[in-house]
């Protein structure tokens, strides 16, 4: 049986970590896997969004990316496989893939525009995220020729419910490929980048998902890349998902019950959680405080300040009608142009410090004369100096 071995990696997003070097052990997972397969690999594709944002040339993310891709290019020459870097979203990759231009060779190619390339007898179609005024322009350039395999960065109609960043101007400009057009013009399979969830559009159309975790929307999901084997005799394929076991974990815990207990119990719980927490992982505690009394809410506030920087807290609290009314009344009082500043200060001091100062004493402290300065709506009368 003659086969083609295709590794697809999507949405690296170098670097979403505050410390870019945290990504190195994850990138080494890819290198180690290549070294394991060696000459059995035929093609390695990166399906867009190598970078998380645009970085200056001297940024350490750029250096990590160059070192990583240099290693990939060396392995491609050593084991004789093809590498294709597909340009992703404008706000992420932009023109930054050009920093890899010196690596380009018969084994290493940057795909900036729609291209059709033969790999081991299969026609690969590469479609970067496509920006145009009309869908017809995309269709004419990319979808009038049938391909065996399509590598695409962007949105497909059926994947739109999963797209999370469509409000961004760059995403509004990008075209969305219609399901029927990708189905009718791809013979074996289509694998996509751009959406970070791993989702199947059809049996032969799917999103690999991001290589690593990027936010709490990734909580509870596995990250990694695809190892695809194509039977060239039958045109069938199988996919083996390789998990990124080193990626950061975003963990969401329901803390409503534990955070209603005593400070002592909460400290014991969070201290144990702190000991079990890996350095890269981020844990969020979701707390519904609508049934909390004042003392319980106060205890929670103390715990939140005690573990600031270690855990994140998401608090759910419905503002009661009387609280809204009180806030509105306070706002009206503070913003009212008819109430003198001294009276506003008097009320604020009384509410916060429970001290009752007379208006005369406040004037004295502020060195205000008996002739009051005008309020906002006072008018300067002709011939009268009020300041």
Locate predicted features:
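Conserved catalytic scaffold of divalent metal-dependent phosphoesterases
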Residues: 84-85, 89-180, 211
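Core catalytic region of metal-dependent phosphoesterases/phosphodiesterases
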Residues: 2-5, 16-118, 183-187
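Beta-strand-turn-beta hairpins that frame and shape the catalytic cleft
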Residues: 1-7, 116-126, 144-149, 203-205, ...
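Structural motif
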Residues: 6-8, 45, 126, 149-153, ...
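Active-site metal-binding loops of divalent metal-dependent hydrolases
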Residues: 10-14, 49-51, 89-91, 128-130, ...
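Short amphipathic alpha-helix with an adjacent loop that forms part of the alpha/beta core around
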Residues: 34-36, 118, 135-144, 266-275
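Conserved beta-sheet core of the metallophosphoesterase superfamily
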Residues: 162-237
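Accessory, non-catalytic peripheral segments of nucleic-acid enzymes
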Residues: 2, 230-387
């Amino acid at each position: 049986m003659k086969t083609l071995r295709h590794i697809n990696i999507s949405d690296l997003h170098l670097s979403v970590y505050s410390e870019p070097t945290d990504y190195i052990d994850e990138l080494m997972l890819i290198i180690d896997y290549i070294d394991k397969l060696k000459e059995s690999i035929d093609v390695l594709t990166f399906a867009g969004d190598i970078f998380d944002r645009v970085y200056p040339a001297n940024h350490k993310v750029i250096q990590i990316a160059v070192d990583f891709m240099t290693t990939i290019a060396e392995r491609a020459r050593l084991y004789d496989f093809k590498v294709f870097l597909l340009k992703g979203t404008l706000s992420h990759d932009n023109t930054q893939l050009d920093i890899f231009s010196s690596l380009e060779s018969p084994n290493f190619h940057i795909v900036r525009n729609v291209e059709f390339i033969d790999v081991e007898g299969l026609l690969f179609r590469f479609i970067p995220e496509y920006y145009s005024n009309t869908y017809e322009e995309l269709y004419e350039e990319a979808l009038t020729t049938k391909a065996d395999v399509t590598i695409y960065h962007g949105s497909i109609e059926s994947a739109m419910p999963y797209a999370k960043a469509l409000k961004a101007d760059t995403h509004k400009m990008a075209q969305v490929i219609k399901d029927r057009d990708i189905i009718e013009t791809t013979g074996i399979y289509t694998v996509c980048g751009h959406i970070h969830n791993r989702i199947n559009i059809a049996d032969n159309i799917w999103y690999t998902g991001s290589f690593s975790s990027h936010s709490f929307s990734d909580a509870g999901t596995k990250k990694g890349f695809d190892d695809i084997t194509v039977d060239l005799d039958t045109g069938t394929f199988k996919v083996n998902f390789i998990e990124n076991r080193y990626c950061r974990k975003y963990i969401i815990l329901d803390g409503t019950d534990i955070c209603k207990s005593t400070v002592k119990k909460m400290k014991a719980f969070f201290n144990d959680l702190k000991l079990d927490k890996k350095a890269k992982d981020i844990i969020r505690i979701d707390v519904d405080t609508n049934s909390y009394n004042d003392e319980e809410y106060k205890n929670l506030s103390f715990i939140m300040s005690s573990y600031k920087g270690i855990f994140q807290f998401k608090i759910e609290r419905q503002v009661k009608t009387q609280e809204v009314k009180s806030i509105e009344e306070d706002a009206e009082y503070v913003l009212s142009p008819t109430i003198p500043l001294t009276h506003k200060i008097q009320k604020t001091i009384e509410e916060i410090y429970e001290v009752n100062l007379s208006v005369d004493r406040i004037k004295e402290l502020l060195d205000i004369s008996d002739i009051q300065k005008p309020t906002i709506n006072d008018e300067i009368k002709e011939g009268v100096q009020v300041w």
